Regions:
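Soluble "head" domains of membrane/secretory-pathway proteins
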Residues: 2-37, 56-62, 70-221
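Hydrophobic membrane-insertion alpha-helices, especially the h-region
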Residues: 41-57
């Protein structure tokens, strides 16, 4: 008697080394449990990856205050890339997040204006010069730059006194020059205090988008 064919045209007698088995049907409860375990595993993996990304790469940040208007508004949410400066340099125009030099328990967000070895000054109208060359700051709103020069004179720097940026330090200012507590008031930011670059605004939705920007200056030293 010929044994039952497993596949059309093939029987267990065609090859004596073939062992034919018939898997038992799993119970519905066992199948459901396996599915639950699989989903749970995937959720845990995704959560772990999310934590690693937040800890080592990207951090969500809430903007508090108006010192970066009009680029950033109070209560907006942004993503900060904490990995950006591991292999790349800090550039002029970068919007950075750093530990406040006078109280490292606090974080500030400002724009990088002066790089190491730069000579910085501000003229009577509030325009910044770097190494004697004017800095293109098209991102500023003129109505928020009326008292910028006064703030310069009230800080550690006075009219006619250039700021020399030391190696491994940076000079930062808020885009809202009339309402920003920045390097004009408390000096330079150590490079080691800068821990991220503002990359993307994700809230509010109407203003969602990249925060990358550059500024131009003729770096003749």
């Amino acid at each position: 008697m010929m044994k039952q064919s497993i596949y059309p045209g093939i029987t267990a007698e065609d090859d004596p080394d073939i062992e034919v088995t018939y898997p038992e049907e799993s119970s519905s409860s066992a199948g459901l449990w396996a599915e639950v375990k699989s989903i749970t595993r995937d959720i845990i993996f995704a959560a772990v990856m999310a934590v690693l990304i937040v800890v080592f790469v990207v951090q969500p940040v809430k903007v508090e205050g108006t010192s970066m208007q009009p680029r950033l508004e109070n209560d907006e949410r942004i993503f900060v890339n904490k990995f950006e400066y591991t292999f790349s340099s800090i550039n002029r125009g970068d919007i950075v997040v750093f530990w406040y030099p006078e109280d490292p328990t606090k974080s500030f967000i400002k724009r990088v204006i002066g790089l190491p070895d730069d000579n910085i000054d501000m003229d009577g109208s509030g325009h910044v010069t770097i190494n004697g060359q004017p800095l293109d700051e098209s991102y500023l709103a003129p109505e928020r730059n009326q008292a910028a020069r006064l703030r310069w004179n009230q800080g550690p720097y006075t009219s006619g006194h250039q700021v020399r940026v030391k190696p491994h330090y940076y000079f930062v200012m808020g885009d809202n020059r009339d309402a920003s507590n920045d390097s004009r008031s408390w000096g330079l930011v150590p490079e080691k205090y800068i821990y991220g670059k503002a990359m993307f605004r994700y809230w509010p939705l109407p203003r969602i988008g990249s925060l990358n920007s550059t500024v131009d200056v003729d770096d003749e030293r």
